[in-house]
Amino acid sequence: MATNAKPVYQRILLKLSGEALQGAEGFGIDASVLDRMAQEVKELVELGVEVGVVIGGGNLFRGAGLAEAGMNRVVGDHMGMLATVMNGLAMRDALHRAYVNARLMSAIPLNGVCDNYSWAEAISLLRHGRVVIFSAGTGNPFFTTDSAACLRGIEIEADVVLKATKVDGVYSADPAKDSEAVLFDKLSYQQVLERELKVMDLAAFTLARDHSLPIRVFNMNKPGALRRVVMGENEGTLIFHE
């Protein structure tokens, strides 16, 4: 298959789940996975791609169980936001060790730990080839990190949100449960809604749809997949505005 000589995206928003960082571990951060992801991001920077990153926090904290046990949802979400900051610190450190300039911004003030989120500063950093990691979600409870990824993607005028998952893209059914499940190459926003496919939560998905922000779902566990996506190769599932 012919490949493009240049990346097809100039500016991307990469959404990593917290679970992706834990690798084979049941909890926390797998250092080898973290370093591999940092190297893959470095490849994009060397190609001239501007990279924003949003990381979830599910590897360190999951509020659903505590909410069922009676914890206030707002408190649980604030704890989840802090988990994303911890993951962001780890990713920033991994990027620095890979000799990639990276800045960590938080939607909630954490002076002395990371920068406060600033749209203008983020744009300036991206234009100068810095990787910008956006943490603490949207800064508000009741919003997922997928919503944060779409919001930041729209704000920084990213060409696409790249949602890194543990599967090869969007399937007609859960491939772990249904051997007949079909992997989609492309889908419109409307097709995703009509088929009730699980891409991301509805608030996040609607935000992307309303601003015609394409989403590509791919498997980050496949070495080189991120680069292939950015170079326009047929990797994962593209969700777009028809």
From Swiss-Prot:
Q: Which GO terms describe its cellular component?
A: cytosol
| KW ATP-binding (keyword) present | yes
Assigned keywords, A-Z: Allosteric enzyme, ATP-binding, Cytoplasm, Kinase, Nucleotide-binding, Pyrimidine biosynthesis, Transferase
Q: Which Pfam families match?
A: AA_kinase
Gene3D superfamilies in UniProt: Acetylglutamate kinase-like
**Where does this protein hold ATP?**
15-18, 58, 62, 165, 171, 174
Give positions of region: Involved in allosteric activation by GTP: 23-28
Q: Which SUPFAM superfamilies match?
A: Carbamate kinase-like
**Reaction catalyzed:** UMP + ATP = UDP + ADP
Q: Quick check: keyword Zinc-finger in the entry? A: no
The pathway noted for it is: Pyrimidine metabolism; CTP biosynthesis via de novo pathway; UDP from UMP (UMPK route): step 1/1
Q: Which cysteines are joined by disulfide bonds?
A: none
For this protein, what is the EC number?
Answer: 2.7.4.22
Entries under CDD domains matching the protein: AAK_UMPK-PyrH-Ec
Notes on activation and inhibition: Allosterically activated by GTP. Inhibited by UTP.
**Residues at which UMP binds:** 57, 77, 138-145
What InterPro entries does its record include? AceGlu_kinase-like_sf, Asp/Glu/Uridylate_kinase, Uridylate_kinase, Uridylate_kinase_bac
Q: Where in the cell is it found?
A: Cytoplasm
**What family, per the record?**
Belongs to the UMP kinase family.
Note the subunit structure: Homohexamer.
UniProt name for this protein: Uridylate kinase
From what organism does this protein derive?
Answer: Photorhabdus laumondii subsp. laumondii (strain DSM 15139 / CIP 105565 / TT01) (Photorhabdus luminescens subsp. laumondii)
Recall the taxonomic lineage recorded for the source organism: Bacteria, Pseudomonadati, Pseudomonadota, Gammaproteobacteria, Enterobacterales
